[in-house]
Each structure stands twice: as C-alpha cells, then as structure tokens.
Amino acid sequence: MSGRGKQGGKARAKAKSRSSRAGLQFPVGRVHRLLRKGNYAERVGAGAPVYMAAVLEYLTAEILELAGNAARDNKKTRIIPRHLQLAIRNDEELNKLLGKVTIAQGGVLPNIQAVLLPKKTESHHKAKGK
C-alpha cells in the first residue's frame, strides 16, 4: 500500500484548553481574542494572554477573599457591592490601584473626625480624688 488511510496511527489526543494547561480558571483563549480585537498591538504573543489571564485571576481572587471577610464580619453569607467597597478601600494597595473607580451601591467608608467626637470629662475623676 502507498500509505493511504489511518491503519495503525495513534488516535488524536483529547483537546486541552490553554487555561487548563496554564492551571487557570480565567479563559486564556478569550483574553487572546480580546487582545487581538482591541487594537492594542499589531501582533499578540502566545504568552501574553496567559500572563494577563493569570494577573486578572489573581486580582479577582484577592478582592473576593477580602470581600468575603467583610461579608463574614457583617454576618452575611452573600457578597454585595458594599462588601467589595469595604474590601478595596481598607486595603492600601487595592485602594491605590482602584482609586479612581466608583463602585455602584458601594457607599463610603465610615470615618468620623476625631475633633467631632465627644470629649471625655476629667472632672469626674478629679472629684473622686479629693
């Protein structure tokens, strides 16, 4: 025979996504497509979408971890925008990164100036001492 057909060839391996190869949850293929369609550069390397997906996944995990802690502190089981706001604004680095970002329904950080707080009276202690 002249080598036609697949008599003894190995079966093709099952397709494996680039996300699973990189050990990521975020979609590497989608990030690659968005980088190409976004006109950021004429060409996009193979490693760029993997790296970017990993960075996005890390930042998301970090924010969700802190927001989950904020929800637990408020005795809630569901993360709401308020918890995201508290998580981001209480973390120095995330606050710097997302400083110009407005979170809808996030509210503000509770902050009362020390000058406005009621003064502690010392006269009560002096009266007992006499």
From Swiss-Prot:
Keywords: Acetylation, Chromosome, Citrullination, DNA-binding, Hydroxylation, Isopeptide bond, Methylation, Nucleosome core, Nucleus, Phosphoprotein, Ubl conjugation
Positions of modified residues (N6-glutaryllysine): K96, K100, K119, K120, K126
GO cellular component entries: extracellular exosome; nucleosome; nucleus
UniProt modified residues of type Phosphoserine: S2
Cross-link type Glycyl lysine isopeptide (Lys-Gly) (interchain with G-Cter in ubiquitin), residue numbers: K14, K16, K120
N6-lactoyllysine: residues bearing it: K10
Stretches for region Disordered: 1-22
Modified residues (N6-(2-hydroxyisobutyryl)lysine): K6, K10, K37, K75, K76, K96, K119
Modified residues (N-acetylserine): S2
Residues the record lists as N6-(beta-hydroxybutyryl)lysine modifications: K10, K14, K37, K96, K119
Residues modified as N6-acetyllysine: K6
Residues recorded as bearing Citrulline in the entry: R4
GO biological process, one term: heterochromatin formation
Top-level division of the source organism's lineage: Eukaryota
InterPro entries the UniProt entry points to: Histone-fold, Histone_H2A, Histone_H2A/H2B/H3, Histone_H2A_C, Histone_H2A_CS
SMART domains: H2A
Symmetric dimethylarginine modification, residue list: R4
Modified residues (N6-crotonyllysine): K37, K119, K120, K126
Modified how: Deiminated on Arg-4 in granulocytes upon calcium entry. Monoubiquitination of Lys-120 (H2AK119Ub) by RING1, TRIM37 and RNF2/RING2 complex gives a specific tag for epigenetic transcriptional repression and participates in X chromosome inactivation of female mammals. It is involved in the initiation of both imprinted and random X inactivation. Ubiquitinated H2A is enriched in inactive X chromosome chromatin. Ubiquitination of H2A functions downstream of methylation of 'Lys-27' of histone H3 (H3K27me). H2AK119Ub by RNF2/RING2 can also be induced by ultraviolet and may be involved in DNA repair.
Protein function: Core component of nucleosome. Nucleosomes wrap and compact DNA into chromatin, limiting DNA accessibility to the cellular machineries which require DNA as a template. Histones thereby play a central role in transcription regulation, DNA repair, DNA replication and chromosomal stability. DNA accessibility is regulated via a complex set of post-translational modifications of histones, also called histone code, and nucleosome remodeling.
Protein name: Histone H2A type 2-A
Gene name of this polypeptide: H2AC18
